[in-house]
Every structure is written in C-alpha cells, then in structure tokens.
From Swiss-Prot:
Source species of the chain: Rickettsia bellii (strain RML369-C)
CDD domains per UniProt: DNA_pol_A_pol_I_C, H3TH_53EXO, PIN_53EXO
Described purpose of this protein according to its UniProt entry: In addition to polymerase activity, this DNA polymerase exhibits 5'-3' exonuclease activity.
Subunit structure: Single-chain monomer with multiple functions.
Name of this chain's protein: DNA polymerase I
Gene: polA
Length: 871
C-alpha cells in the first residue's frame, strides 16, 4: 500500500507489449485477438490490489515523430513493426484503462517517458511521493528521495544499489553512462566498443560526457581516446536523445489524477465483451462487487453435439484432435458411477455412452461393451504431442486403473482453479448436470474447456501460481490416485473383537449411568440427557440453547461437572468416547473393506481445504485417534500384507520449523540448528527453570504453548487447555513472545496483510484466502486462520512435493514399496521385508531435502507390522 497522496504513474505501452509477449494467444467471444488486452487488464488489477493508490494515471505514447527525431532522424528506425494481432489490439488498450477508471495521460509529439518525467517532477516538487511502474531503464534517471521506480517484471522496487550494480554509477549519472553505451533497441548510437564497465569508469573519473571531451588528453587508453574523439558527435547526440523532458506542456493538478473504483456496470460489460471470465473473481474481491453471470458465450454459438457409437467415428475424432493438438475430455458420473465420456473440440462435443453397472475402482473398463473406445482414447491420453484438458482428473485415472500413470500432457481445470483460490468456495462446473445426469448440458460445458484453460493458465501466471499448480498440485494428483488404489489392509477379525470389547464396556457404562440417574433413557439424546442431568438430578451448569430449546450437554459442560466431582459426568464422557470409536471405526471399517482387494480404499480430497492440505473421506483415515489407549488399539488393526512391513515417516515439529523460517525467529532457528529439544527450551524459559529441574508436566505444557501459539491461541483457550487461570496463561504467552522475538510481529503483520488483501501466502506463494477476515462477528476465528494458513499451507506443500519425488524414485528403482496413506505430517508406506533396508534411507533423505529452509527438516522413520507399533 502506498502513502496517502502517492501518485502511481504507469508506463502503459510498456505493460501492453510485455503482456503480449508473456501471454499465450487468446481470442474474445467474437474471435478477435485479446491476449495483450487480457494481460494488461490483469496487470492493472494487480497494481490496484498491491498499491491501493489514491492517485494514479496510465501514460501512453501518442505515436508518430517527436523532438528526438528532429535531433536524430534515425531514432528508433531499426524497430520492426509490431505483430499484426498486437496492432489490432493497440487502439483498445485505452478502453482497458478507462474501464478500470484510470486517468490517461498522453500528448502528441511526446513519448510516455517525458510525460512521466514531467508529472513525476511536478508531484515531487510539492513534496508528494511518486511511484513509477515500469521496466524501462531510461526511467531510472528519475530516481530520487520522492520518486521511486517499481519494476513489475521483477515485482520489486529498484534501489540505488541495484542501479550501481548494473551500471556502475548512481541514478543521477545514468544519463551520462547510457549516452556512451547507446541503446540498440532505440537506435541510439553511443560510442562504439564502450560498454557499461568502461562507461562507468569514465563517468566516475570525469563526471559527465561533456567533461570527458573537455579533458580527452586525460583518458589514459590511447585506443579509447581515439574512439571517443571519432565519436564525439554521436555521444553528444546520444546524450540529448537519452535525456528526459521534464517540461512537457500539460496541465498538472494532482487532484485530477485521483483514482476511484470503476463503474460496476461498465466494468462488468467490458469483462463480458472480451470474455475475461477468469478475471471476474479478482475484480469482485478487489472492488467488493458481484459480476452477474452472462449466459455462456459458448452456448450462444452453434454447438454441435454428436454421439459416437463405433470405432470408425472415434478414430475420425482422434485424427481431428491430432491435427489441432488439443481437446477436452470429461467423464460424466451419476452417484459415483460413470455414464459417459465427453470429448470436445472448438464448438463440437462428442458423447460416448459407458456401459458400466458396477461402481468399483477395479472394474470400470472390464465390460466388453466398452472395449471398442477405451484403447483409442487411451492412445490420445498418452500422446505427448496432444494437450488434454479435463475437469477433475481422478475419475479419468480411476477409469484406466493400472494404466493411468502413462497418461501425459493433461491439464486439470479444477486443480488450476484451486491453485488460484484456495479458501474461496470452489464452484463445481458440473454440479447441476451431475444431479440430473444431463449429458447434453454437460457436453456444452466441456466444449468450453479449451477457452477456459487458455484464460486460466494466463491467470495462474499473472498470480504467480503456475508453479504451485504444475509442480505441486498436478503431479501429486497421480500419486494420490496410486495411493487410493493401493489402499491399506485392516484386520477385520481383530476389529470385530475390539468392537465386542467396546460394546461390553458400553453396556456396563449404561447400567451405571441408569443407576446414578435413577431411570433408563436414551443416553444418545441430548434433550433427554439434559432433562435427566439438570431437571431430575438438579446438577449445576444447566443452560438451555435458544435454538434447540434444550439443555447444552456438550463436552465442556460434562467436563465442568466432572471437575465438581459428579461421577455420572465421567461415565458419560467415557460412554461418548467408546460409542464414537465403535460406530466410526470398529463397526464401520470392516464394512468398507473392498471385496476384490480385501483392503480399505479411502478417497483423498485435493481441493477441499483452505491451505492445500489433503483431506480423507469414506472412510476418513486421517482422524484415527492417537492420544488414547483405545485409539492405539484401533491403529493396531492397520497391518501389512504377509511378507511386508509398514513404514511410518513423520516430519518432526515441522510447523514450528516452518514458523522459524517464514517469520525469521532467530532463537527458534538456532534451537533447531543446534538440535535442541524445542519443548524443553520453551519450558525452561516459560517456567524459569534449569533443564534438570523440569518435569514431564512442564514439557507437556511447553508443547501445548508452542503449538497453541501457531494456531493463534488466546489466553482463555490456553488456560482451558492447560487447566490454569487466564492470568497465568496470558503470562505464558507474554513470556513466549519475549523469548521468541519476531513471532508476535509476524502474527500482527500477517493479520494486517490478510485484512488488506483478503488472503495470505505460504512459503511457495500459494494464496490461502481468508474471506471472513473483515467480518466483525468472525474476526477472531479468521485471524487465527490467517496466522496459521502460511504455516499449514507450507507444511502441506512440502509433504506433497516429497510424495511426488518419492514416487518417482520408487518407480525409477522399480521397487515394490508403495505409499498407502498420507496423514498430514506423516506418510505411511507398505514395503516388502527385503526392501526395508533400501527404502527407509531413501524416504528419509527425500523427505528431509525436498525443500530448502534455514533450519533442518527432520523425519522420524520406523518400520513394523502394524500402525500402532510404528507410531
């Protein structure tokens, strides 16, 4: 964000040309080229978001000749004309600026550089600050205390040190050096054979070009002296050409350049007209508006939808796809079962009905009715020269079962959108048609895949999210698919036995509860339980919920009753714990064992969290309890196949290590570098004790403080967790911030950034949106989420990178070891016993070195027969 009256001066055509060459070709709904316009619009939106200026202007060249051509007719004579598709867009660039409500500055006979110089000088003369947005080196001459240069290509302010490093002189001497060097792009001659090093040396010695020629005899090199003597006129002309005109005759009123948000309707119409749908969300977030959905442009065109029912028709499509080099593909599902393949080219959709009654991972293409099309499509999917665009890649990978890993050159629109907007509602393109299983309507959406891909890939690059998508999210999707197909073995007999044990104890607990309450009732009914506790038994803490019109019987109430010595509360808490474990795990897991593989195959969701974390469902194997004896008994049910062992590789204190790096907490960094026990160190500082004086309770509390701080815990929350007073908890937090200087500053800076931008970023640049950050009712929750998101997001991306690298290494070595589960910080492998000694060091080395940070990343790794043994 800029200072109050800062003027932002934007080099218009500099942006437009950069946008054109940086973007892939893009056409509007009318078929006109708009790639440069899209890039220019995206760049201006980014500037508004990053700088939030009060005053701003986009400055354009007027075209034609100017005073420099009078000095030197060959000025810019060598420049080739712009490409034809760019020329067609140039008259429209001012519309982009106008629709974003930017004032425009231009004047016949003057270049944008001179107008920028004039307005920068006049603004600085009244004591206000100027930020020039340009990558043009000529404008570096303007740098001073009041005029800053921001290079959008490098996304940073240019400093005097940067200028000295590149040109050997400070900005006030840049004109002199550049006059000697010349500029081929503008056909400015300079002095032959004099480069930056020689030029800076001469200017350092003589001060100006004029002084060099006034003191030529003092130039020590005879060859340089002769060259200079022969090029005096060229050097002096170059000096005039490179200099900026600070006195362009234009009215200057800073107030006239005040920027205000654009007209909602005009902006909406503009974005619709040019088909910039991928910019809607950014415009909505930036200007706090809602852009209404126009009817899809693709539906307005004549969309041809054909059924493909035989091999010859599909082969004809394949030939077309090979010629154009790109096509859309989607598997339409209804209640999890595949019902159609939909293929698309521009304005054409092709439907192949799938004969598949069974809804099973391993029987998707087993029916003879499907054989005629599966191989032809597979050949297209594995052709590196043809790009495939899909939405939700995993059903396609499931369809091709063991052959899925050969699929290449494929892009996933769902993952692309997630890389742009984690934390915002993820719109399912096919939600409506999947409910109704309307194949024709789905086909119309698939027809738009190619255009949507071309727009979204540009937005990924504009938002610096391309690497996140291409190097993290897309490759790990293939690894997740393999992991889901591998599944994990569970001992069903053991779970049934455990379920019986839990059931017996539950019955015993129920009898004791009924005795204490004096009657039988439905313990699982909060309403009945509340009436028993607070009406019949007259226990304290009874409060009714206005919405439910019943007593609150949550864990917090039962824990309060337990602290007051009411034995029924302990029995109820234990009953709830056991019934949840029985219902969720010991009863449920055996029912979810696949009939073919005899293993459990969970589904990992890749786009459901704010931070990039994976989540698990059907069943959720990431929430298997760990901190209780019963939880460990359940983990004992997860076993290795005969002749195999399970390997657990778990990142140690990864979130604290990430915090130390991204917040630059020197005390934390040093502790990790020294391999100190961080919880012991924290305990010593918080409780003012020596290491030998600490108890396990001190360390437990320190651990809770360390990890609680990461999640933005309040004094109240910490007090409850540690069972201490609010005052004591507040003192712990105060001491923590004093010991680990920088943590509190990081938290405040992160909250401020989130409030200003609506998102935070992780170590890799992933944007984690926090849409509720400015909602007064949910502000504290959103602030805690904002503080933790960069840490949790970095953690998630580190382990996803490691998963991909490990998968590649296992494939390269042709090992039988396979990844079977990901549980946030932990990876669980199943390995043949004879591969254990080989694979364990590989896993540890790759996990610890997948990302470079200022502190070591440590992995704890163990092998055993079941999950409990190794955790």
């Amino acid at each position: 964000m800029t200072k109050k009256n800062t003027l932002l001066l934007i080099d218009g055509y500099g942006f437009v040309f950069r946008a054109y060459y940086a973007q892939q070709p893009l056409t509007s709904p009318k078929g006109e080229p708009v790639g440069a316009l899209y890039g220019f619009t995206s760049m201006l939106l980014k500037l508004l978001n990053d700088f939030k200026p009060k005053h701003a202007a986009v400055v354009f060249d007027s075209g034609g000749k100017n005073f420099r051509h009078e000095i030197y007719p060959e000025y810019k004579a060598n420049r080739p004309p712009p490409p034809e598709d760019l020329i067609a867009q140039l008259p429209l660039v001012r519309d982009v600026a106008r629709n974003l409500n930017f004032p425009i500055l231009e004047k016949n006979g003057f270049e944008a550089d001179d107008i920028i110089a004039t307005f920068a000088a006049k603004t600085a003369s009244i004591g206000e600050e100027v930020v020039v947005i340009s990558s043009d080196k000529d404008l570096l001459q303007l740098m001073n205390d009041n005029v800053k240069i921001y290079d959008p290509l490098k996304a940073k302010y240019i400093t005097e040190d940067n200028v000295v490093e590149k040109f050997g002189v400070t900005s006030d001497k840049l004109r002199e050096v550049m006059a000697l060097i010349g500029d081929k792009s503008d056909n400015i001659p300079g002095v032959p054979s004099i480069g930056p090093k020689t030029a800076s040396s001469l200017i350092t010695q003589f001060g100006t070009v004029e002084n060099i020629f006034n003191s030529l005899e003092q130039v020590s090199s005879i060859k340089q002296r002769e060259t200079l003597q022969n090029s005096k006129e060229a050097a002096l002309i170059s000096w005039q050409l490179i200099g900026l005109d600070y006195n362009v005759d234009m009215d200057f009123k800073l107030d006239a350049l005040e920027w205000s948000p654009p007209d909602h309707n005009k902006l909406t119409e503009f974005l619709h007209e040019y088909g910039f749908k991928s910019l809607y969300k950014r415009a909505e977030n930036l200007f706090d508006i809602k852009i209404s959905e126009h009817k899809e442009v693709i539906e307005e065109k004549a969309v041809e939808i054909k059924d493909i029912s035989n091999k010859a028709e599909l082969e004809a499509f394949a030939e077309k796809a090979k010629k154009v080099g790109i096509f859309g593909i989607y598997i339409l599902q209804n209640k999890g079962a595949n019902i159609a393949f939909i293929l698309s080219l521009k304005n054409q959709a092709y439907i192949i009905k799938i004969s598949n009654e069974a809804n099973n991972l391993f029987t998707y293409n087993s029916k003879a009715d499907n054989e005629w099309f599966t191989d032809i499509i597979f050949n297209l999917l594995t052709d590196q020269s043809i790009k495939k665009i899909t939405y939700s890649l995993k059903p396609l990978l499931k369809f091709y079962a063991s052959r899925a890993q050969q699929i290449t050159a494929i892009e996933d629109l769902e993952l692309m959108n997630y890389a742009l907007s984690a934390g915002l509602p993820q719109k399912n393109l096919f939600e409506a048609v999947e409910k109704e299983a309307t194949i024709e309507e789905a086909a119309k959406i698939v027809v738009g895949f190619i255009d949507l891909y071309q727009q979204t890939i540009l937005e990924l690059k504009d938002n610096k999210a391309f690497r996140i998508y291409k190097e993290i999210d897309l490759p790990v999707c293939f690894v997740i698919d393999k992991m889901e197909k591998a599944g994990i073995k569970v001992d069903a007999n053991y779970l049934n036995q455990l379920s019986s044990e839990f059931g017996a104890e539950i019955l015993k607990l129920e009898e004791e509860i009924f005795v204490l309450s004096g009657m039988k009732f439905n313990i699982g009914s909060p309403k009945q339980l509340g009436e028993i506790l607070f009406e019949k038994m007259q226990l304290p803490f009874g409060k009714t919920s206005a919405k439910a019109n019943s007593y609150s019987t949550g864990a917090d109430i039962l824990e309060k009753l337990s602290e007051q010595g009411y034995p029924i509360a302990d029995l109820l808490l234990r009953w709830r714990q056991l019934t949840k474990l029985k219902n969720t795990y010991t009863d449920s897991l055996p029912k979810q064992i696949d009939n073919i593989t005899r293993r459990i195959h969970t589904t990992f969701l890749q786009t459901s969290t704010t931070t990039g974390r994976l989540s698990s469902q059907e069943p959720n194997l990431q929430n298997v309890p760990i901190r209780s004896g019963e939880g460990n008994k359940i983990r004992q049910a997860f076993v290795a196949e005969q002749g195999y062992k399970l390997i657990s590789a778990d990142y140690s204190q990864i979130e604290l290590r990430i915090l130390s790096h991204i917040a630059d907490i020197k005390a934390l960094k040093q502790a990790f570098i020294n391999k100190d026990d961080i919880h012991t160190q924290t305990a010593c500082q918080i409780f003012n004790l020596q290491k030998e004086e600490l108890t396990s309770e001190h360390r437990r509390k320190a651990k809770a403080i360390n990890f609680g701080i990461i999640y933005g815990i309040s004094a109240f929350g910490l007090a409850k967790q540690l069972n201490v007073s609010n005052t004591e908890a507040a003192e712990y937090i105060k001491k923590y911030f004093a010991e680990y200087k920088g943590v509190q500053e990081y938290m405040e800076a992160t909250k401020s950034f989130a409030q200003a931008n609506g998102y935070v970023t992780d170590f890799f640049g992933r944007k984690c949106f926090v849409p509720l950050i400015n909602d007064k009712r949910l502000k504290q929750f959103a602030e805690r989420a904002a503080i933790n998101a960069p840490i949790q997001g970095t953690n998630a991306d580190i382990i996803k990178i490691a998963m991909t690298l490990l998968d590649r290494e296992i494939e390269k070595r042709k090992l039988k070891t396979r990844l079977v589960l990901q549980i946030h910080d932990e990876l669980l492998f199943e390995a043949p016993i004879d591969e254990i000694e080989t694979i364990m060091p590989i896993i540890k080395q790759i996990m610890e070195n997948s990302t470079n940070m200022d502190v070591p990343i440590i992995t704890e790794i163990r092998a055993g027969n079941n999950w409990m043994e190794i955790h």
